[in-house]
């Protein structure tokens, strides 16, 4: 028995030495996967926080070495996510790559996919979604309900379509966080339109804006998070706060879920998809847009659901079973936005008071500098009474201010 133990001990020591020498973690007989994320903002940061629970080696590609994700990943590469060679060199030795922003070099991802690197979401779905013109054409081709639209190449084109007003003008590429969107009520607003390729959408009289996060495994299994009801800041065109689950009539709820699944199935890609939907006053539901990644409308799931959207994406990337999307509690999420008139080193006024609030969970994004309208963090409130949670959210909004140090 002693000889057997010594033999087994020697084999175990050799195994440990192998792991150390190769700097690889062996889990269940396989190497730790190397996963890359294109982009290093707050979405990447929260993905990395969730990654700590999994056997994965994380890589970030981002042009800003002081980005929110830089100090949380195993390996950081400073570089342009829109440059073909940079993206290709970053990804060629990785097992799987995902994104935290759509504005990436898809051609490099296509090349990497052809060489065996898993790209989630697929380059083909990303190519469809990243341009709002091709995205709207995708909805039309696949008979997915969406607002009527026209395509414009420049501001001059708008003069030929004044009968289409009131409408929403959306830049084909480059828009984010409320930028790249203009409401054109009549021809006097034409000067606010975009002098670049864009979509002109017929205005829908909106009763509610909702979002449904859809998770798709590599085998095609689908699960949905309950719809979240989004309330936007009219001045910033940014998410102000949201309620989950959304307050919807049952028939609207089922209609919204069916449309979200229909749209994501047509993309034919694994991944996590945030389907933003518009509900009109007659209860009709239209797809506004899809984000093929983790999304602001899913942040509440960190505390509000059994498996967060970030946990869910890692399950998909690493071939684990999909998690439970059931809500733990009703939640209200409030974005923390940089105050108007303040640009510079960020200071959080009222933070101590917010921390005293029961069942309030604060997430700061690690951004050193603030500017008007910049997303600096979010707060999730949990409870059972929606009215009380919304009241708390408004109180916190007035209590907490992100200003620049003097």
Q: Positions of the model-derived regions?
A:
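A conserved helix-loop-beta module that forms one wall/lid of the active-site cleft
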Residues: 121-181, 187
